[in-house]
From Swiss-Prot:
Family: Belongs to the TPP enzyme family. MenD subfamily.
SUPFAM superfamilies with a match to the protein in the record: DHS-like NAD/FAD-binding domain (SSF52467), Thiamin diphosphate-binding fold (THDP-binding) (SSF52518)
Keyword Ribonucleoprotein among record annotations: no
EC number(s) stated in the UniProt entry for this protein: 2.2.1.9
Domain of life: Bacteria
GO biological process: menaquinone biosynthetic process
Lineage: Bacteria, Pseudomonadati, Pseudomonadota, Gammaproteobacteria, Vibrionales
The protein's name in its UniProt record: 2-succinyl-5-enolpyruvyl-6-hydroxy-3-cyclohexene-1-carboxylate synthase
Gene name for this UniProt entry: menD
Length: 564
């Protein structure tokens, strides 16, 4: 048998992608490159995998993040060797904090070409450090290493991912030649060593873990509890909300949950001494999902637990989410499974904290008076649920997500964010991945600095068919720093960095429709009309004064603090 390295490279990649499929991978994100040829060709040849392409590896990583976020499945990412690999790090860091399952398949030069001056060769082993939950550095494909070893080695890292979430890194060094027209059958005896696996269709080496046992309803039904709903799916949020209602407890909904309650606006009313004192009578906090937006809710939670309140945290993610290092009972299991066991019988609700909805209503009333129906960030946040309608919502990491946390009320909206590292990079790409996975219309709310940061990824919307509305709230720089005690003399130059840019020509560059409304009525008509009758992407630019939003927030907080 004549040796053909290109064919052997492809046999390894074919085996790899088939096992990835059996672990649940359905989407593969591919950037251009020559060294990654075996990976790209075999991903393309697999009839049950869907390919997504992008010329920018940083954007590609975030595209995969969005796909994984929305599909709740692992997503594979294929890049060539060199700095292409390094450009995945921002998305990998985000997945390391929020749990999305990325499978990073990085092509590499063989070991003899690393560290010796060869072109496009960097040290790729361990490049993602502890941002991945597991890594595997494969040898160059060869017949002395069995396909059985390849499968059990890949299975090990994928099982670790199945348990803990996050990204895994499989580094794939491919020797040349990379191109060949020879058939794989020249290595048929080698391929046949795993023919039973190929025929049976299951994972080569499987593992099972038992579920933890949650408490019974009898243990908690007489307690004064508070339910906190963080970053979860809409279905999980509804189940958690129903549980809180069944118990008669206050339910505090983070905007990432896509739901609201009679206790909305807590980031504002927690500044009122009377409201805070009433909520502080609780003796049990149950948090579903992670990554809360509200800093004041974090501070209140810390105060309560330090005073002796029990703190339970329900999340399938094994990783710690306990930034104040509090005593915490973490139930590592699916939220639905936990609730199904706990709520297995009727209970008489023990309603308490009955005065708090009054503060919530006052937050909403005063916010509307401050905004005065003008086109401003506070008014958009107040009307966000009606603007999004039945579409999905993606909230960027600007001042606006905090405004939604303060005054917004989302009534059953599938909501997505990147609130792990809370970076302003990759938001266009992540939102595109979410929409590709769900095939639903989407409203994307993003700040101007975030939009500038990921401008390349507007290319992902150029051939969009499903309606998407991208609203850029342009307050000319980082208006969020108006809420922080930064040195006033350096605030503009070193923090806000005003740019003076508009986004009309960015939209034209990528073939997107563009409008710049001047009233709330026009904004509503444009968004609702595009969802009803449009297709493709519409970029809506909303220009607001730089310090308007922070002034509105201060006015609202001052009013609510004074209530008795």
């Amino acid at each position: 048998m004549n040796h053909d390295q290109a064919v052997l490279n492809r046999i390894w990649c074919e085996t790899l992608f088939e096992e990835l499929y059996r672990f649940g991978v359905r989407d593969v994100c591919v950037a251009p490159g020559s060294r990654s040829t075996p990976l790209a060709l075999e991903a393309n040849a697999h009839t049950r995998l869907k390919l997504h392409t992008h010329f920018d590896e940083r954007g590609l990583g975030f595209l995969a993040l969005g796909l994984a976020k929305a599909s709740q499945r692992p997503v594979a990412v294929v890049v060539t060797s060199g700095t292409a690999v390094a450009n995945l790090l921002p998305a990998v860091a985000e997945a390391g904090l929020t749990g999305e399952k990325l499978v990073l398949l990085t092509a590499d030069r063989p070991i003899e070409l690393v560290g010796c001056g060869a072109n496009q060769a960097i040290a790729q082993q361990g490049i993602f450090s502890n941002h991945v939950c597991a890594s595997l550095n494969l040898p160059s494909p060869n017949t002395q290493t069995s396909l059985n070893w390849l499968l059990t080695s890949v299975d090990q890292v994928l099982h670790q991912q199945a348990v803990s979430g996050h990204a895994v890194h499989i580094n794939c060094p491919f020797p040349e030649p990379l191109y060949s027209n020879a058939p794989k059958s020249i290595y048929q005896s080698y391929i046949d060593t795993v023919d039973v696996w190929r025929a049976e269709g299951g994972i080569y080496s499987n593992k099972q873990m038992p579920l933890p046992m949650p408490p019974s309803l009898a243990e908690i039904e007489q307690r004064k509890g508070v339910v906190v709903i963080g970053s979860v799916t809409l279905q999980e949020a509804k189940q958690a909300h129903q549980f809180g209602a069944q118990m008669g407890w206050p339910v505090l909904c983070d905007p990432q949950s896509g739901t609201t309650s009679d206790w909305s606006g807590f980031d504002i009313w927690l500044q009122n001494p009377a409201a805070r004192a009433q909520l502080s009578q609780c003796d049990l906090i149950i948090q579903f999902g992670r990554r809360l937006v509200s800093k004041r809710l974090h501070q209140w939670l810390e105060q309560q637990v330090q005073a002796g309140c029990d703190y339970w945290y329900v999340s399938p993610d094994f990783e710690r989410d306990n930034q104040s290092h509090l005593p915490q009972q973490h139930f590592v299991c699916s939220i639905a499974a936990w609730l199904n066991v706990v709520t297995n019988r009727e209970v008489q609700p023990v309603a308490w904290a009955n005065e708090l909805p009054r503060f919530s209503a006052e937050v909403n009333k005063q916010a509307r008076e401050i905004a005065q129906s003008s086109l401003c960030e506070m008014m958009i946040a107040l009307h966000l649920s009606s603007l999004v309608g039945s579409a999905d919502l993606f909230l960027g990491n600007s001042l606006f997500v905090r405004m939604v946390d303060m005054v917004g009320q989302l009534h059953g909206v599938e909501t997505f964010t990147n609130r792990g590292a809370s970076g302003i990079d990759g938001l266009f790409a992540t939102a595109s991945g979410v929409q590709r996975a769900r095939s639903n219309p989407m409203l994307l709310m993003i700040g101007d600095t975030s939009a500038l940061y990921d401008l390349n990824s507007l290319a992902l919307y150029s051939h969009q068919e499903t309606p998407v509305v991208i609203v850029v709230t342009n307050n000319d720089g980082g208006a969020i720093f108006d809420l922080l005690p930064v040195p006033p003399q350096q605030k503009q130059a070193l923090y806000q960095m005003p740019h003076g840019y508009r986004f009309e020509f960015a939209a034209k560059q990528f073939g997107l429709d563009y409008v710049c409304p001047t009233s709330m009525t026009e904004l509503t008509e444009r968004i609702v009309g595009h969802f009803a009758h449009g297709c493709g992407a519409l970029l809506v630019e909303v220009n607001t004064p730089p310090n308007q939003a922070s002034q509105h927030i201060k006015q609202l907080a001052d009013h609510v603090r004074s209530l008795v």
